[in-house]
């Protein structure tokens, strides 16, 4: 994850975020979307399968595009989902961009240029994408289960703490609630930037994980 954060696709850091706007505008251009730095970009990079929760996304896409947001999808998988996202890109030009392919370089450009990263997985033992997205300053919106629950701290509007957004019940309704919460926070630039910096500052190294397990063991004994 540290290596990804230092690749040439990143032109910014937690202390200096202005370069992320350039990556965003370039990403919008690459997907044929209007180049607007003010509109939030919600991205998904994943296998297009039911295990990854794409049935929720498909069921809510009509609702999602009613908001001032651009949606980008990269991935391959179930033929029905591939068809669905091609259809959405054709039906909602300027709102939805889809690349039904596997492309590591494009995935990195999406991580770097997007504002939000959606992971509504039905189950996820570990998951890396949410950690990568945080390192890129792209806030994850996740179904709080398994590794997603362990690695993403949901935003608390009272304290301002958090590294992303999460919903407990596996349903399109609750997923949309969290997306709307993310959009609301995005409309408050100072508060949004604070959470982005908190997410980028997370340490997912093995050294940190080992120390946390050791501390937990010591507490138990």
State what each model feature region is.
Residues 1-221:
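Catalytic cores of carbohydrate-active enzymes across secretory and cytosolic contexts
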């Amino acid at each position: 994850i540290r290596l990804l954060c230092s690749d040439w696709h990143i032109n910014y850091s937690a202390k200096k975020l202005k370069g992320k706007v350039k990556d965003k505008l370039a990403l919008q251009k690459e997907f044929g979307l209007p180049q607007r730095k003010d509109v939030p970009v919600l991205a998904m990079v994943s296998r297009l399968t039911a295990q990854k929760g794409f049935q929720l996304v498909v069921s809510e896409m009509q609702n999602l595009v009613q908001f001032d947001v651009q949606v980008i999808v990269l991935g391959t998988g179930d033929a029905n989902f591939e068809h669905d996202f091609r259809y959405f890109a054709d039906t909602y030009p300027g709102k939805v961009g889809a690349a039904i392919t596997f492309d590591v370089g494009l995935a990195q450009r999406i991580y770097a240029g997007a504002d939000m990263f959606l992971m509504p997985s039905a189950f996820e033992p570990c998951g890396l994408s949410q950690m990568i997205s945080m390192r890129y300053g792209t806030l994850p919106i996740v179904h709080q289960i398994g590794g997603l629950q362990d690695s993403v701290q949901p935003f608390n509007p009272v304290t301002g703490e958090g590294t992303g957004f999460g919903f407990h019940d596996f349903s399109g309704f609750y997923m949309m609630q969290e997306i709307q919460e993310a959009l609301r926070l995005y409309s408050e630039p100072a508060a949004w930037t604070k959470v982005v910096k908190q997410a980028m500052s997370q340490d997912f190294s093995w050294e940190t994980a080992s120390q946390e397990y050791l501390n937990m063991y010591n507490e138990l004994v």
